[in-house]
Amino acid sequence: MKNFEILAPAGAEEQLKAAVRSGANAVYLGVDNFNARRNADNFTTDSLKEAVKYCRLRNVKVYVTLNTLVFDRELEELYKTVKEIARSGADAVIVQDFATVRALKEICPQMPLHGSTQMAVHNVSGAKLLEEKGFSRIVLARELSLEEMKAIRKEVGTELEVFVHGAHCMSASGNCYLSAMLGERSGNRGLCAQGCRLNWKNRHNREYALSLKDMSYLDRINSLMKIGIDSFKIEGRMKRPEYVAAAVDSLKKAMENQVYDKTALRSVFSRNGFTDGYLQGKRDVSMFGYRMKEDVTSAVGVLKDLESLYKNEIRPNKADAKLILEKDKPAVLFLSSKGATAKVTGEIPQEPRTAPLSEEIAFRNLSKLGDTPFFLDSLEFENPHGLTLPAAAVNALRREGANELENILGEKTYGIFDAQPPVFSDRETAEKPKTRIRLQRFSQYSEDFEKADLLILPLDEILKNIEKIECLPVKIAAELPALIYPEDEDEVLKKLAKIKKSGIVRGVTGNIGGIHLLKKAGFRILGSHGLNITNSLSAEAYGAMGLSDITLSFELSEKALKNISSDIPRGAYIYGYLPIMLMRACPQKSENGCLDCTGNTVLTDRKGIDFPFLCHNKKYGVLHNSVPLYTGDKNLRNLDFVTFFFTVESKKECEKIYDAYLNNKIPEGRKTNGLLSRELL
């Protein structure tokens, strides 16, 4: 029978113990920086070693999260952190950034790699790419339905992990820039400010339009087991130990077809109940909810009862003891478990004043293993001369023996290499970068754009206007949809084959699945902002994958942008209403679905500011910043090209903005430098 894994969050030591004692098979945790929950208490590199030891002795695996984006200035610290994680003996590392992948492969090639949900694997192609890169496990995107997970499971051999309980991000994982753009705290760097939980209103004036209920798939866990998902993950490294215990206990019971306490699970934490909308493919208004006063107060009544789930230490390991007492020699205790044996010596036994030490009394004293992970199963007792040993001396042997056995069993070693991050040198580029034009609609096209080096249009927009487009005197690139689910992959390949016949051989993608699809179609691959490239190692990694050029993340400051150096040509956005959230559950839907929706609407924040919201073929929606980026007045050295990212603008507005740049003028109207003048935390 397949062994399924319950994977629990451990934001700190107490949560870790709650997870283990409640029945988790594995925990995931973060150390200091470089993890997606930097505001959790987390673990130091020293406490990590103790955490790994504690878990290993209780047959629980530890996965360390290094699932954030890294800047060049942090590469040295990243390499040091990777070495400490390898020394701890952790069972795997969960990663997002390909710089972290490189560091792990150079320092500890034996360490298993798990692809974080931040890598946005939502199709077969993305899973295959990570499988080819040597990942042993992939954490699938939260937005997938059961049938979509099944399709991925059918095509890849790597382990698959799925979130089954906890908070739902409104955005597709790895594609949210809301927190960063509105402040200095990036979700891609573990410091999400949860701006989506504030009171956003949609076109129907419905409040909290970006706040989803927490997910709970426990009632459908057998369906996930049936399709072959390997690991069931609970979200919640920021939550209290009672929550962790309740979630683990409930999941365990659900997997064993037992009744679990739904009321307690909802009371300890929820946002007006739970949803399984994504799993069922029912992405409607019932998925939305926010944390109400009664959700907060209901937790108080269940916390005390939930403590009982993790109050007592578990002792899963059978131990066998052998105690030898001989004249004029120190007492010897052998303590064995799981194929390992500890040997300790103690006091010299004495002639008894009354009665010798009996096997029964020795067993009783040696059985008091307390907070250790062992229980005494048998004792082999040798006392040929009828000697005695004080209870305190027997207890000391027991403590030392258990401690030594813990040290032996709790250790796991990897081969570790003393690798260092490479030193990069600046690469000279053209005095003024080449320009690219990205249009949302072909109706925005102007002859002025023939001065650009490249024109980018959505794949479907090219197909609608193929006869006109194939006659244009400018190079064309097809932008793949930002989200391509398993049921759409073959259709995308067919569309690429059609435009290839018209001479279009360049494709733009911001997702690793898109890279795999474009390779399969025989296209030149241009990486966009969605790849989240924030350092030189990541840039090199995408170059090694065969990309022709890359657009760097717009979460980079001007200084960080200039620090990136690699052989692959690179660019950045110079203008545009930046896409700050990519979502599959539509916030604009009403009880009547998409009725009367044009697909070009706005969402309004609590200050009354409107943010453009564009629907893409009813497959997904994109929230754009309320103010357009413009950095044409900055000295963007070290870039090969800059891209004008046009979305909601009219043709005339597009012309004016591009013309202003070409004539060294600043376009009229409100604009922002974005994060170019700010350094993210």
Label every PLM stretch briefly.
Residues 2-121, 139-143, 147-233, 238-541, ...:
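Active-site pocket-lining/capping segments in soluble small-molecule metabolic enzymes
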